[in-house]
Amino acid sequence: MPTQRWAPGTQCMTKCENSRPKPGELAFRKGDMVTILEACEDKSWYRAKHHSSGQEGLLAAAALRQREALSTDPKLSLMPWFHGKISGQEAIQQLQPPEDGLFLVRESARHPGDYVLCVSFGRDVIHYRVLHRDGHLTIDEAVCFCNLMDMVEHYTRDKGAICTKLVKPKRKQGAKSAEEELAKAGWLLDLQHLTLGAQIGEGEFGAVLQGEYLGQKVAVKNIKCDVTAQAFLDETAVMTKLQHRNLVRLLGVILHHGLYIVMEHVSKGNLVNFLRTRGRALVSTSQLLQFALHVAEGMEYLESKKLVHRDLAARNILVSEDLVAKVSDFGLAKAELRKGLDSSRLPVKWTAPEALKNGRFSSKSDVWSFGVLLWEVFSYGRAPYPKMSLKEVSEAVEKGYRMEPPDSCPGPVHTLMGSCWEAEPSRRPPFRKIVEKLGRELRSVGVAAPAGGQEAEGSAPTRSQDP
C-alpha cells in the first residue's frame, strides 16, 4: 500500500516514538510536531525539523500523520474561564471546593462593562475589579493589558498585585478549550519559534507581519480584541478542513496577546499590486487567464465545501514565487446563505446586489464578485467602476448598469463577466462552469490549463538521500 507523500513545508504529527535514533535520524515522541524540509528519493524517508527541539534529521513517512481538522461543534473558546454575567455569589459557588489559584472571570453586575477576576485563595474567593483605562484593562493601574486573555496569561506567570498566581481555570460548563483542542489536533504553534519582521499588510482587524517559524517564511496576522479573536478562531477552525493549491495555507495558531494566525508566506504579494507594477509589457493575456483560472479553481473548491468567501477581490488574491494565484483573507468567510453582516463594512463595488440589499450571501454572490475580479485582472489592476462613488455604483447597478470591458479584454472573458453579473443569482454560472470556460479560453491561446484540484501532499521534489 503506497505511503502518502508530504510536500516541503507540510506540518505533520508523529504516530510513534523514536527514542533511540540512528545517526542522522530525528528523535521524537508520539504526537510531536515536525515540519517536512525535503523528501528523500528512496524508501519514503524525509528530512524534517522538530518543533520543540529545533533539530533536523531523517524520519520515515510511515511515522507521520496529517494533522486533524478541528471540530467546530461545540464551538472552541479562547476564554473557557469566562463565565459571562454571573453574580459574585455564583462565582464563589463555582470556585468550590477551595483551591489556591483556581479562578474565573465574570462580567461585573455593579459596574456594567467592567469585568471581575475571581480567585480562590485559602478559604476565601477574592474579587478583583478589572478597570478600563485608555482602551486597556487593568486591576492595579500599574500594569495594563490589551484584553482578558493577555491579563490571564500575565497573572499565570506572575502574581503581581493579586493574592496568588492563577493556576487552574474554572471552565464554564459546555466550554471547549481552544488551547487544548488546538494542541491535540496539532495546530497550536510555539511562540518561542516565531520571529516577527516587517509589516506587509494592514487588515480591518489587525496588522499582517512577515515572519519566520522554524526557519520557514510565514505571514502572521495578530488579532488582539477578545471578540474579534474569537470570531477569527471560528474561521480558523474551518480553515483546518481546507487544503487546495489555490488557497493560502494555514500553518497554525499561537495564543499570545490575543491570537496569532500563522499562514504560508506568498512572496509576490497581492494580485492588484502585482499587475499594477508590471503592466501589459510584462504580463501576457495568457498569464492573466492563468491567474483567473487559479482563482476560479480555489473558489470552486470553497463552493464544493458550501463555504462563501464574501470578500473576493484581487486585493485578497496572493501570487506565489512560481506565479500561482491563491485566494486569501477568509476573515469574512461563512457557511453558505448566512445573513447579518453590517452593510456599512461591505466592499460595495465587489458585492452582489442581493447581498447589499438583503444581506443574502451565497456562492452566487461570490460569482458576482469574481466577475468584478476578472475586470480588475484584465484592466491590469485598475479600480472597478472608475470615477463613480459607492452610492452611484450601488444605484447604477440596481438599475442594470454593467461595466464596459477593459481595453484588449478577450471577447469570451467579457461574456463571462456579463454572466457573472446576472441580476438573478440563479442565472449566474457555478464556479465549476467558470473553470471549464477559462480552461477552454486558455487552451485557445495555446496554453495547457494546469491540473487543478485538492493539493496532493505528494508533489514534493526529491533528492537522493537515504538513511
Swiss-Prot record:
Signal peptide: none annotated. The keyword Magnesium does not apply. One of its GO terms (molecular function) is ATP binding. Its EC number is 2.7.10.2. One of its GO terms (cellular component) is cytoplasm. Residues 81-170 form the SH2 domain. Enriched in lymphoid tissues. SMART domains: SH2 (SM00252), SH3 (SM00326), TyrKc (SM00219). Belongs to the protein kinase superfamily. Tyr protein kinase family. CSK subfamily. This is Megakaryocyte-associated tyrosine-protein kinase. The lineage of its organism: Eukaryota, Metazoa, Chordata, Craniata, Vertebrata. The gene is Matk.
